[in-house]
């Protein structure tokens, strides 16, 4: 050590005297009387410098990439570090041509598809290739998601920890209208409209059952998987699913006659039945289940779907339980009340006190226009109605900065497009399909995003920031997917077949150059969300 220190100082092979008691007391003597003090002090300085340099060298052994992708020792909820090393992942369902597809992963923290060094050009879910992954049912808290592809009817389990396909959990008829998966994963439900079947995959019995319900096109299930409701297109009937006791009836016909069901399956020793639910309905198209598990809000589309009056029908969940076996002709009546919604309703979301309802209202000129209605859940009364994007509203979620986001499809056929065609240059003629609403005020001021307008007298044109492949300067197209990247002030969307990112601060759009996909973006999911409510 001493020789190495001396060599560093340039003293050749000169030896350094051993410490002695006099050296330890030298601080009390005049400097001129002790020339070795300079050597001792210099030696200490050099040793300190060497120690600092060696420490710095050790600490700098890691590359910059190590810090880019370094996870904390204790991850949130003990979640494993994924193979991609990305901490904030958004998964995108992409179809190349309708028959070949993929599930791509992008870095939602940096809004890039590659790693920082660009040594890995992209990330994706391994083992997945179904053609049209149009529906992602995401459960980040459970470290998985389910992807339904309408090209082959497959419902695939995606393992978020390994970023790989865990295989198909079942196959519904291709082109099914809707699927429903509860977070218990005990059943999977599929509404197969073309076949007129409501298919139930029961993981508790390893059985699959198909209930004959002509034109069934929607199915909804609550969080506990105790209530499953089915809806029929162009109908005012709502069905619930219930399970018979083991060997309760010998035949299908006996079960139908005893319970008043529309169908029971299988034909011998039936297990499941579907029965109509008493209540007031007008083209029911969806169900929102209350946060406390007591109420089911049935969304009646009304005139938007060829009926008469849009409304919400409130039902008690207790009588709808799948273990409640009805007796014909008397059925348990779960209805609480029916609340008309003048603005229309096809999508709903609650914060615990207010139910936000998105839909369309028929206008005197025969066109529809979009509205957001608010309902006080304590009094079951409509308290407000606000203009939003036109189209069929099916996406709604909360996000950062106390915002609410609403997405719709086929927005270029409503009142806003008519205003645009008439030369209106205000936001009233913005016919895009995404609306941002800032909550918390006495009144709400929704804004359609991106904000665009055509040129007028003294008004310059404002076009979409990042046009899609069709290069339409004012319209992105239908919004088919949206997810909230929690705590990062952004939402990701599948908007007109491409990925677009919006700020929850002001609704502005982030650059999508490095997350844009080759093919058609169909749906998105935030894989690392803190809760399941971010998707």
Tell where the protein language model's regions lie, with residue ranges.
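Bacterial Sec-dependent N-terminal signal peptides
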Residues: 2, 21-22, 28-35, 53-92
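A short beta-strand motif characteristic of beta-propeller blades
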Residues: 65-67, 114-128, 164-170, 205-211, ...
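Repeated scaffold domains used in trafficking and secretory/extracellular systems
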Residues: 73-81, 130-140, 173-185, 214-225, ...
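Residue position within the beta-strands of beta-propeller blades
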Residues: 92, 147, 190, 230, ...
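Structural motif
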Residues: 98-107, 153-158, 196-200, 236-243, ...
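Short loop/turn segments that connect beta-strands within beta-propeller blades
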Residues: 109-110, 159-163, 202-205, 243-246, ...
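Solenoidal tandem-repeat scaffolds enriched in leucines and small polar residues
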Residues: 203-349
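Blade-level signature of beta-propeller repeat domains, shared across WD40, Kelch, NHL, RCC1
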Residues: 493-535
């Amino acid at each position: 050590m001493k020789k190495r220190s001396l060599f560093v100082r340039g003293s050749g092979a000169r030896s350094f005297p051993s410490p002695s008691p006099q050296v330890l007391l030298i601080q009390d003597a005049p400097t001129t009387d002790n020339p070795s003090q300079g050597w001792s002090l210099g030696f200490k300085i050099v040793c300190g410098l060497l120690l600092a340099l060696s420490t710095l060298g050790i600490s700098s052994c890691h590359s910059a990439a190590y810090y880019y992708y370094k996870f904390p020792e204790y991850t949130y909820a003990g979640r494993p570090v994924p193979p991609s090393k990305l901490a904030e992942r958004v998964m995108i369902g992409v179809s190349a041509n309708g028959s070949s597809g993929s599930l791509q992963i992008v870095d939602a923290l940096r809004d890039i598809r590659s790693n920082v060094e660009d040594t890995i050009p992209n990330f994706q879910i391994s083992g997945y290739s179904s053609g049209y992954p149009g529906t992602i049912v995401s459960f980040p808290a459970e470290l998985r998601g389910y992807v339904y592809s309408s090209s082959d009817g497959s419902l695939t389990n995606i393992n978020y920890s390994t970023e790989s396909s865990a295989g198909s959990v079942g196959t519904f008829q291709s082109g099914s209208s809707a699927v429903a998966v509860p977070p218990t994963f005990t059943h999977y439900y599929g509404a197969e409209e073309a076949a007129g079947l409501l298919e139930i995959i029961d993981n508790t019995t390893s059985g699959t059952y198909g209930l004959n319900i002509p034109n069934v096109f929607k199915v909804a299930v609550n969080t506990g998987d105790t209530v499953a409701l089915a809806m029929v297109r162009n109908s005012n009937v709502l069905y619930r699913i219930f399970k018979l006791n083991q060997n309760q009836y010998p035949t299908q016909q006996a079960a139908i006659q005893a319970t008043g069901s529309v169908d029971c399956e299988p034909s011998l020793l039936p297990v499941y039945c579907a029965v109509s639910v008493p209540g007031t309905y007008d083209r029911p198209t969806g169900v929102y289940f209350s946060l406390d598990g007591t109420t089911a809000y049935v969304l009646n589309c009304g005139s938007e779907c060829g009926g008469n009056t849009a409304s919400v029908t409130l039902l008690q969940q207790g009588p709808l339980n799948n273990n409640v076996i009805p007796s014909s002709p008397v059925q348990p009546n779960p209805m609480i009340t029916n609340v008309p919604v003048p603005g229309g309703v096809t999508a709903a979301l609650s914060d615990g006190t207010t139910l936000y309802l998105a839909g369309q209202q028929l206008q005197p000129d025969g066109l529809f226009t979009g509205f957001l209605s608010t309902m006080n859940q304590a009094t079951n009364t409509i308290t407000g109605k606000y203009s939003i994007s036109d189209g069929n509203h099916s996406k709604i979620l909360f996000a950062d900065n106390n915002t609410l986001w609403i997405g719709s499809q086929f927005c270029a056929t409503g009142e806003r497009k008519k205003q645009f065609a008439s030369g209106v240059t205000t936001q009233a003629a913005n016919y895009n399909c995404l609306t941002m609403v800032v909550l918390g005020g006495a009144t709400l001021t929704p804004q359609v995003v991106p904000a665009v307008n055509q040129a007028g007298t003294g008004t310059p044109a404002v076009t979409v920031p990042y046009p899609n492949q069709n290069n339409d300067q004012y319209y992105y197209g239908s919004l088919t997917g949206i997810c909230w990247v929690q705590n990062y002030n952004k939402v990701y969307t599948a908007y007109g077949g491409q990925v677009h990112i919006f700020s929850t601060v002001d609704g502005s759009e982030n650059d999508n150059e490095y997350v844009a996909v080759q093919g058609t973006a169909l749906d998105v999911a935030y894989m690392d969300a803190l809760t399941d409510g971010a998707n």
